Amino acid sequence: MQEKIRIKLKAFDHKVLDQSVKQIVDTVKRGGGLVKGPIPLPTRRRVWCVHRSPHKFEQSREHFEMRIHKRLIEIENATPQTIEALMDISLPAGVEVEIKLS
């Protein structure tokens, strides 16, 4: 039975996220694994509306936005050496990694 490894990456900055994805894909390809992806998942966008003044001027508001970018990588035919190489990768700060085996 073949195992699939799904790696889901999340970050606020899409450039840092894409660099991390490229680093993971290169490592897996060097180890001889088969890579599907990176698959861009929907970006989550959160918007907050805040009053500029603490007491009055209801019409004066300011909007703040936060975007969470996501990517999915599927790895098939991963060897133990590939998994060991993935464990040794140091990713930049601000990138959240979620790994699932199926």
UniProtKB/Swiss-Prot annotation:
<keyword id="KW-0687">Ribonucleoprotein</keyword>
<dbReference type="InterPro" id="IPR001848">
    <property type="entry name" value="Ribosomal_uS10"/>
</dbReference>
<protein>
    <recommendedName>
        <fullName>Small ribosomal subunit protein uS10</fullName>
    </recommendedName>
</protein>
<dbReference type="InterPro" id="IPR036838">
    <property type="entry name" value="Ribosomal_uS10_dom_sf"/>
</dbReference>
<dbReference type="GO" id="GO:0000049">
    <property type="term" value="F:tRNA binding"/>
</dbReference>
<comment type="similarity">
    <text>Belongs to the universal ribosomal protein uS10 family.</text>
</comment>
<dbReference type="GO" id="GO:0005840">
    <property type="term" value="C:ribosome"/>
</dbReference>
<dbReference type="InterPro" id="IPR027486">
    <property type="entry name" value="Ribosomal_uS10_dom"/>
</dbReference>
<dbReference type="GO" id="GO:0006412">
    <property type="term" value="P:translation"/>
</dbReference>
<dbReference type="GO" id="GO:1990904">
    <property type="term" value="C:ribonucleoprotein complex"/>
</dbReference>
<keyword id="KW-0689">Ribosomal protein</keyword>
<dbReference type="GO" id="GO:0003735">
    <property type="term" value="F:structural constituent of ribosome"/>
</dbReference>
<dbReference type="Pfam" id="PF00338">
    <property type="entry name" value="Ribosomal_S10"/>
</dbReference>
<comment type="function">
    <text>Involved in the binding of tRNA to the ribosomes.</text>
</comment>
<dbReference type="InterPro" id="IPR018268">
    <property type="entry name" value="Ribosomal_uS10_CS"/>
</dbReference>
<comment type="subunit">
    <text>Part of the 30S ribosomal subunit.</text>
</comment>
